Swiss-Prot record:
Pathway: Amino-acid biosynthesis; L-lysine biosynthesis via DAP pathway; (S)-tetrahydrodipicolinate from L-aspartate: step 4/4. Pfam families: DapB_C, DapB_N. HAMAP family: DapB (MF_00102). It is found in: Cytoplasm. This is 4-hydroxy-tetrahydrodipicolinate reductase. GO terms for cellular component: cytosol. Catalyzes the conversion of 4-hydroxy-tetrahydrodipicolinate (HTPA) to tetrahydrodipicolinate. Belongs to the DapB family.
């Protein structure tokens, strides 16, 4: 492939744990070209992003100015893609900026509110620019969610437990929220009360979301990303669990999303929509 036919990719949050994995994956992809790396950690400013990611020099320095890199991405012959793994406080403005420049966002940062998602969807529609918001890039997690939807036909009681490393800023996780949304969109109400319940400590039973589904969040060092969906019925428990042991497991989904977003003209939410 010539460089003119490669997908130009900007990684925002390039020095973070997920950002480094994305840098390595894009650098190894035959149909992509890393054109920019952004991170606001001053310890990495000016360093070669390949050296930071551990894949060797790529001659792409880490900068702390997203706007200038978006401008650079628009100068390529093929419309660029921005992969965002940053922070819930900044992701909304990052995505709006990318769309405004005609750069297609692939968003792995969780924490966007329903209102923000709606606004970004409207903005992407008006700009006819593809945008993917993916709470979890793992194929295994998509399969778990699909299995949970199928199981919900036979169980009326369900709770979700999500466990992550203690540097994750938002709770509950976007993946757990997405799972609850998939279950709550099936036209049934879960967990009918069996006794009069009292919480002696507020929040002891977890966060209540749509259709009476509860999510419990755990944050501990030593964890990466894990989720259980537990169904209960008289005399039995059915547990679905997904465990991440290495962040490289997300890269197949990230690369697929980069390729797919170039074909979209609107915002799409969830990896299952593009599989």
């Amino acid at each position: 492939m010539t460089t003119d036919s490669l997908i130009p990719v900007v990684v925002n949050g390039a020095a973070g744990k997920m950002g480094r994995e994305v840098v390595k994956a894009v650098a190894q992809a035959e149909d992509m070209m890393l054109v920019g790396a952004v991170d606001y950690n001053p310890n990495y400013r000016g360093q070669d992003v390949g050296e930071v990611a551990g894949c060797g020099a790529l001659e792409v320095p880490i900068v702390d100015d997203l706007q200038s890199i978006l401008v650079l991405a628009t100068q390529e012959k093929i419309q660029g893609v921005m992969v965002d793994f940053t922070h819930p406080d900044s992701v909304y403005e990052n995505v709006r900026s990318a769309i405004a420049y005609g750069v297609r966002p692939v968003v792995g940062t969780t924490g966007l509110t329903e209102e923000q998602l709606k606004d970004l969807a409207d903005f992407a529609d008006k700009a006819s620019t593809g945008c993917l918001v993916i709470p979890n890039f793992s194929i295994g997690m998509v399969l778990l969610q699909q299995a949970a939807v199928q199981a919900s036909q036979y169980f009326d009681h369900v709770e979700i437990i999500e466990l992550h490393h203690n540097q994750k800023a938002d709770a509950p996780s976007g993946t757990a929220i997405k799972t609850a949304q998939m279950l709550s969109g099936l036209g049934k109400t879960y967990n009918p009360p069996m006794v009069k319940e009292t919480e002696t400590i507020a929040g002891a039973k977890g966060a209540l979301v749509d259709d009476n589904i509860r999510i419990h969040s755990v944050r501990l060092p030593g964890l990466i990303a894990h989720q259980e969906v537990i169904f209960g019925a008289k005399g039995e428990i059915y547990t679905l669990r997904h465990d991440t042991s290495d962040r490289s497991c997300y890269m197949a989904g990230v690369l697929l999303s980069i390729r797919k977003v170039t074909q979209l003209q609107s915002l799409v939410y969830g990896l299952e929509k593009i599989l």
